[in-house]
Amino acid sequence: MRAEDIASVLEIQSCCYDETKLESEQSFLAKLRASPTSCFVALVPDGLAGYLVAVPAEAGSPPPLNGPSYSVPLTANALYLHDLALHPAARGTGVAVALIEAYFQALKQLKVQFACLTAVNDSKSFWERYGFRAAVPTGSGAGHMETYGEEARYMSTPVNA
């Protein structure tokens, strides 16, 4: 992902989430700047088909939704998958699988202990197929969960070395 992709990312995001879950350009840019090697886009001839944003974090501590800034914690031991979204026309084409594979490759390169995410829009069972299990957020992360909505579920899985 590059800064030039953010306008298309925002368009895709608006197709996938209700207004309570939309993030600003500033929020996306903050995460991209914090971890450019773990933010990905899937390109097709017509433009962006989807994106995945992930940032190093502390396991159990998801960042708030639409945070205006992001700094990688010194004690980061997880790669937090913050957002995966596809253009509606790209669903069922393998784009999601390709983006998730890129995420798992980034996990290996960063040598973290956990993969984490917050499941929204009834996606818990989707993420369970990739080995994620419900977990309890801790510290400031517990308070951040309310920014994702009532149905949001924090999930985590250990990374095999």
Name the predicted role of every residue range:
Residues 1-9:
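A short beta-loop-alpha structural element at the N-terminal edge
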Residues 18-49, 53-71:
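Active-site rim helix/loop that mediates acceptor-substrate recognition in acyltransferases
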Residues 37, 149-156:
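Short hydrophobic/aromatic beta-strand or adjacent loop that forms the aromatic wall/cage
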Residues 52-85, 91, 139-150:
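Conserved acyl-donor/pantetheine-binding loop and adjacent beta-alpha core of acyl/acetyltransferases
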Residues 86, 92-105:
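Conserved acetyl-CoA-binding loop-helix of GNAT-fold acetyltransferases
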Residues 100, 105-120:
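Conserved GNAT acetyl-CoA-binding A-motif
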Residues 109, 121-147:
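Conserved active-site alpha-helix within GNAT-family acetyltransferase domains
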